[in-house]
Amino acid sequence: STPLYSSAASDVYKRQPYQYSITPSSTYSVDPWIGCYSLIDNCNAILDNLETLPESSERNRIEGESLALRTYAYHYLIRMYAKPVNKYPDNPGVFVRLTSSTTDIPRSTVKDCYVQMVNDIEKACTLLTGTSSSSKCYITEQAAHGIAARIYLDLGDYTNGTSHANKALSEITLMSKADYKNKFCENNTETIWYFT
């Protein structure tokens, strides 16, 4: 037997997707929820403590990155755990927590989740204006616009979606065919932002 097969065979959670046996209680179902809310909690803790920093471009960058990451996490959650906004705007969405408080809150409607995401990502785009990074693991202006484009496309707002997509792609240089096979996992010119 091969090590890969033995490893997968020994772990029931690794086998579940291949046996079509994922259940609501399996880790494949809850890991995204836990991971996204952990990210949201971290972003909220940063946003709650921004006043301890002096007004500066660095503070704007930190606030913009936190808002964009929080928006990204809510967008991931809403697409995974709620119904589409265009057909079911009044259905339950996810819990929209905007502070690091642990007080129980009710689920917001899908529409309210999108309203909050739009508000946060638009503010993030403004705060991150002119930012760039040689590392693709930081949220920049282009990355925030990319997140905004996806949200507006979900809403069916193609005018704003196209506008944000164009801004996200404005500084992207396409790789040559030869570069593609050698730079798939590197900080290549076609990558706007990556999140792991």
Residue positions per predicted region:
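Residue-level signature for tetratricopeptide repeat
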Residues: 73, 149-151
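Conserved, well-structured interaction surfaces
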Residues: 14-81, 108-109, 125-129
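Single conserved hydrophobic/aromatic residue that forms the stacking wall/gate
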Residues: 1-9, 13
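Hydrophobic-face positions in mid-chain alpha helices that act as interaction patches
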Residues: 8, 16, 157, 162-196
